[in-house]
Design a protein with these regions (language model features):
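SH3/SH3-like (including bacterial SH3b) beta-barrel domains
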Residues: 48-60, 118-131
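SH3/SH3-like beta-barrel superfamily modules
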Residues: 59-92, 130-163
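Catalytic domains of carbohydrate-active enzymes, especially glycoside hydrolases
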Residues: 225-250, 349-354, 437, 515-525
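Aromatic-lined carbohydrate-binding/catalytic grooves of carbohydrate-active enzymes
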Residues: 235-270, 364-373, 537
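Aromatic-lined carbohydrate-recognition surfaces of secreted/lumenal glycan-active proteins
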Residues: 288-298, 356-359, 384-423, 481-495, ...
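Boundary regions of SH3-family modules and the immediately adjacent low-complexity/disordered segments
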Residues: 82-109, 150-203
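Substrate-binding cleft of secreted/luminal carbohydrate-active enzymes
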Residues: 435-449, 459-546
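Active-site-adjacent "subsite" loops/lids of carbohydrate-active enzymes
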Residues: 203-220, 279, 291-345, 509
Length: 546
């Protein structure tokens, strides 16, 4: 009896052991195995499902814990993943094993003609690519936390993602000026320019005043900057437009100049440290700082790099001299790079809020010398129109300067209030759609004596003149998509044409009121006095206080 009982116990124990072993083997064999993986997609977001089978959007490039468990959904296999303690189910093609591979775009379309970069980072250019072209993606720039990338690589270099799309339908967006084929001065038709425009940004930590009441400050004035700061404190002035480079007049010894234009570096009045010390006083006073750079009029740079100049074919191909200066060609990308790097340095090292590009144009009468006389080599490598070169430079400059937290403004002639492309390549809508601020220069003494059929000499009646001019400028601004703000130059000096007129406080106020009544004052004004004479500016204290 005892032996039978023991046998039963042994048998029972054996059964228990077998059952426990079976359970253990089952558990071991069914234990969830986890490994690192990344969410991947051909857009910045990945669509996945949660445990309730609801569709959820997650940012691509995120690290997840990939389970060896799968789930059948809609006839497809989905992998179980863990992200932040939450379970999701991801389609197998949206899982990769390294973060760089999480960008799945294979081909994209160029929907705005744009610059091509040499590298995944930096401002060095490799060429140009036209709207409508299809690229095969072979790489990309750094993947950002929001799942986007700034640049895509193809066999010709890198393109900013903002100029690319996977939606071919976007190529059918019509040009609002497509019926305009006028080309009166040979600088290109309005219909050949880009009006998709840059979305206007609010740079974090860099607040542009709603109305900029501005004084122009040249290199010499920086020596006594305290006087101008005191004037600003007594008035409503809140912005200084400060020279970085004015043609051959250079303010400070820039490291970029030392590297790329030693003649410019040697011509500088201040060291960078000295100049920054003066700028710090401006910043400490709460004044918005705009750095002015003359772009395509630069004698010193042409001395160092004649190969980038507009060439005079009547003078053995030497740099073309016009208006007392040599002119870098707006078609040459090395010129673009130099000026943009100079601007970025000014923002990063000196703290400018905004860069204002002046002389962002070809020389006056370029149509006569280049088109009629065939006397110039403009070095037009990409067969662009003059207006395309100007607009595309500004597109490049805006992209680069926005990346370092600065705004961009461009100076244009008062002539741009007319609805045609000027000979020197400026067309109001093409520029206003790209930059943050457009700054026209309708100086009264630069107009024809009886412009707009005004009976009086127009610089004797600046209110009437700028009211008439402003109404025309507003028409151009109103037809511009994605338009910039308008900050207009006004005349802060006595007229240089007969009859000579003293421009006193009343005349300054007349200009401001004319612009305001025309509805074009918008982002304020800049008082232009080439000498930046403090005595002249003090004469306007009443007008500047309003």
């Amino acid at each position: 009896m005892k032996k039978k009982t023991l046998k039963r116990i042994d048998l029972l124990l054996l059964v228990i052991v077998i059952l426990l072993t079976t359970v253990l083997v089952y558990r071991i064999s069914n234990k969830e195995k986890l490994s690192d993986a990344y969410l991947a997609s051909d857009t910045s977001n990945v669509f996945v499902y949660d445990e309730d089978d609801k569709e959820v959007s997650l940012v691509r490039g995120q690290l997840v814990s990939l389970s060896d468990k799968t789930k059948e959904m809609n006839g497809n296999e989905y992998h179980k993943v863990y992200l932040g303690g939450t379970v999701y189910y991801v389609y197998k093609d949206n899982i990769v094993l390294d973060r760089e591979s999480s960008v799945l775009e294979k081909s994209l379309y160029v929907y705005r003609t744009c610059s091509v970069y040499e590298d995944k980072e930096g401002s060095k250019l490799a060429g140009l690519i036209e709207r409508g072209e299809k690229i095969n993606v072979v790489g990309h720039g750094p993947l950002k936390d929001d799942g986007s990338v700034d640049r895509y690589q193809f066999d010709g270099g890198y393109i900013l993602s903002k100029y690319l799309t996977n939606d071919k339908e976007l190529l059918n967006i019509s040009n609002p000026f497509s019926n305009d084929t006028s080309n009166p001065y040979g600088a290109g038709s309005a219909s050949e320019l880009d009006y998709i425009g840059n979305e206007k940004v609010q740079v974090e930590g860099n607040v542009m005043p709603d109305v900029c009441k501005s004084l122009y400050i040249n290199r010499e004035a920086m020596e006594d900057i305290e006087d101008y700061i005191e004037l600003a404190k007594r008035t409503a002035v809140n912005t200084f437009v400060i020279d970085i480079r004015d043609a051959h007049i250079v303010s400070y010894k820039s490291d970029i100049m030392k590297e790329r234009s030693i003649s410019s570096y040697d011509a500088a009045a201040f060291t960078m440290e000295e100049f920054k010390a003066q700028l710090d006083k401006v910043k400490d006073a709460g004044i918005y700082m705009v750095g002015r750079i003359t772009v395509f009029k630069d004698k010193n740079f042409m001395i160092d790099h004649p190969e980038f100049a507009i060439a005079d074919l009547n003078d053995d191909g030497k740099p073309f001299m016009y208006g007392g200066s040599y002119w870098p060609s707006p078609f040459v990308r090395e010129v673009w790079e130099y000026n943009v790097e100079l601007a970025k340095e000014a923002v990063i090292k000196l703290g400018f809020n905004e860069i204002e590009f002046d002389y962002v144009r070809f020389p006056e009468q370029i149509d006569y010398y280049a088109d009629k006389l065939n006397a110039l080599d403009l070095q037009n490598k990409y067969n662009e129109t003059r207006s395309q070169a100007i607009q595309r430079f500004l597109m490049y400059a805006v992209d680069e300067l926005h990346s370092v937290g600065a705004y961009v403004s461009a100076d244009v002639f008062g002539e741009t209030s007319n609805n045609y492309v000027t000979a020197y390549g400026q067309y109001w809508p093409a520029i206003s759609s790209v930059v943050d601020v457009i700054s026209p220069m309708p100086y009264p003494d630069h107009f024809n004596t009886h412009a707009y059929n005004i009976e009086e000499v127009v610089w004797e009646v600046p209110y009437k003149l700028l009211l008439a001019w402003g109404k025309e400028a507003k028409k151009m601004q109103d037809i511009t998509p994605n338009r910039a703000r308008v900050r207009t130059f006004i005349q802060g000096y006595n007229s240089i044409s007969r009859p000579y007129v003293v421009y006193d406080n009343e005349k300054l106020l007349d200009q401001i009121n004319g612009l305001a009544d025309a509805g074009i004052l918008d982002n304020g004004y800049i008082v232009w006095n080439a000498g930046s004479y403090i005595d002249n500016y003090c004469l306007y204290e009443d007008a500047l206080s309003r």
